[in-house]
Each structure stands twice: as C-alpha cells, then as structure tokens.
C-alpha cells in the first residue's frame, strides 16, 4: 500500500496528500459498506502518528492503546508494528 511506503520512507507531505485524497474518495463512494469505517480509522490513526512525528514513547503508547481498543481498523498489524 502506498500509505506504508510514504510513512516508512518519511515522505510526510506526500502521505498527508494521500490521506486527504483517500478521505475524499471514501466520502464520495457510498457502496463500500463496512470497509469505510476500517479505512477511516486507518486514516485517523496515521494522522495522529504524523502529528507526533517522530513518535515519542508516550504518544506511541497512547495511539497503540487506542488502536487495540478500536474494533474496525484496516492494516492493524502494520500500525501496531509501527507503534512498537
């Protein structure tokens, strides 16, 4: 996924642009059902990670707990790995 490449490569401007366009795409599409919540949560968590970039230990812990408590998250495994 392009999101992973941008985040792991440190391309923050490109990642932010991708998140904005992906969010707009999700708003336009009405036929994707439950996938919308999964991807909206992914976007929300990646934005939180970007706001505190580079991640401090306290921010990692807070976001990791929030990801674990949220039921519908796309790419949960990748998010948890980034927050180790």
What spans do the regions from the language model cover?
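C-terminal non-catalytic interaction modules
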Residues: 1, 11-84
């Amino acid at each position: 996924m392009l999101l992973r490449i941008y985040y792991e490569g440190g391309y923050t401007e490109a990642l932010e642009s991708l998140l904005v366009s992906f969010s707009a795409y999700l708003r336009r599409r009405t036929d994707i059902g439950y996938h919308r919540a999964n991807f909206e949560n992914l976007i929300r968590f990646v934005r939180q990670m970007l706001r505190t970039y580079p991640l401090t230990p306290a921010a990692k812990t807070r976001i990791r707990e929030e990801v674990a408590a949220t039921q519908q998250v796309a790419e949960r495994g990748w998010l948890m790995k980034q927050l180790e």
